[in-house]
Amino acid sequence: MRAMNRYENMRFWILVLMTSVSGFTQGMLLPLISIIFEKDGIDASLNGLNATGLYIGVLFASPLMEAPLRKFGYKPLILTGGLTVFASLLLFPAWKSLWFWFVLRLFIGIGDHMLNFSAQTWITSFSRKGQLGRNIALYGLFFSLGFAVGPYMTRLVNVDERLPFIACSIISLCFWLAVFLLKNEHPEADLENVSFLATFQRFGKVWKLAWVALLPPLGYGFMESSLNSSFPVYALRNGINVDAVSMIIPAFSIGSIVFQLPLGMLSDRLGRRKVLIAVLLIGCACFAGAAFSKSNAIALFACFFVAGMAVGSTFSLGISYLSDLLPRPLLPAGNIMCGILYSFGSMAGPYLCGVIIKYTNGAVFFLLICMILFVLSVLIFRFKKTTAPVPRHS
C-alpha cells in the first residue's frame, strides 16, 4: 500500500511538472517572438496573427485526440507531444522567417495539446472525492509557474536571439525523460464507439450538459494570449523597455500562483460557480484600472498581479467545474473541448488586440478584456444547473 501511494504521488508530480514545462514554453514564446518581430519592424496585426499558430495547432489536433488516447493510453501521447515540442524548439534558430516560425508554433501547439490534454485527463480521472479542486489547482499553479518564468527568457535575446530557444529545448528534454518512469494507463471505457464521428457526438453531449464550464477556458485563452503577445507591442510603443516588460508580464502568473491553490480549495467548499463569478468581476475591475495606467510600469505591474490572483485560476476552475457536471466517460471529450475553447480565445486575442493597438492608442485592448470577463460572469450567474452532481470515487 505504501509503495502504491509513493507511485501515485510520483505520477501526480511528474504530470504536474510536465505541465509546468508546457507553461514555460508558451510563456517564453509569446513575448519573445513578439519582441523579435517588433524590433524587426513587422506590423502589429501580422505579429498578432503569427501568434495564433500555436492555437491553430491545438484546434487542428483537438478532434483527433480522443481515439488515440483511448487506444494507446496516456503515456504514449505525453511522450509524443513532448518530443514534438522539443524538436520544434530546436528548429527555431535554423531559419528566421515569419511563416517558418508560424509552422513551428503550429507544431508546438499540437505537441503541447497532446501533452496537456493527456496529463489533464489523467489527473481528473484518478483524483479522489474532495481532492479534485486541489489537484487541478496544483496543475494550474505549476502551469502558471512555468508561464511566469518563461518571459524572463526574453532577456537572453540581448545576448543571442537563438539562445532562448536552445535553453528552452534542453529544459523540455530533461523533464520529458521523467515520463518514462510512469506506467501507462487508459481512460475509463464506455460502451460507445471510439471514432471521429463518435467524438463529435460526445462533444454535443458535453456542450449540452456543461457549456457554462467551457466559458472560463475561452475567456482565459483570450486574456492570457493578449497579455503575453499584444502587451509587449503596446508597451514598447509607449516607452516601456524590454526589461520592464519582462517583469510586468510574469506579474499576472505570479498572482495566479499565489491564489491558485487557495481558490481551488475554496471552490471545493463553496462551489465552482460562486468562486468563478467573484474572480471574473475582480479581474474585470483590474483590467479597467490597467486601461488608465498607460505607461506607468508600477501601476501596470500592480494591476497584472491582482488580476492574476483572481482570474489567473479561471482555466483550472473551469476544468474542475466541468468535471463536476460531466459523467466520467465524457471527461476526455470535455477536456478536449476545454482545449478547443481555450484555443479559440487564444487565437482571437492576439489578432483583435493587434488590430486595436494598430488603430487606437492601445489601452483600449484592456477594456476589451474587461468587457469579455464581465459578460462571462453574467452568463455563469444566469446558468441554472439541471443535472445532479456527478459522483466521484472516494
Predicted regions and their residues:
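Helix-breaking motifs and short loop linkers at transmembrane-helix boundaries and internal kinks
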Residues: 73, 94-96, 271, 293-295
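Helix-loop boundary and gating motifs at the non-cytosolic
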Residues: 6-55, 221-234, 238
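A late C-terminal transmembrane helix in Major Facilitator Superfamily
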Residues: 329-359
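Cytoplasmic helix-loop-helix junction between adjacent transmembrane helices
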Residues: 106-142
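Structural signature of the two symmetry-related core transmembrane helices
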Residues: 76-90, 274-288
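Helix-to-loop junctions at the C-terminal end of transmembrane segments
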Residues: 61-73, 260-271, 357
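C-terminal membrane-cytosol helix-exit motif in multi-pass small-molecule transporters
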Residues: 169-191, 376-384
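Juxtamembrane intracellular "pre-TM" segments in multi-pass secondary transporters
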Residues: 1-9, 184-213
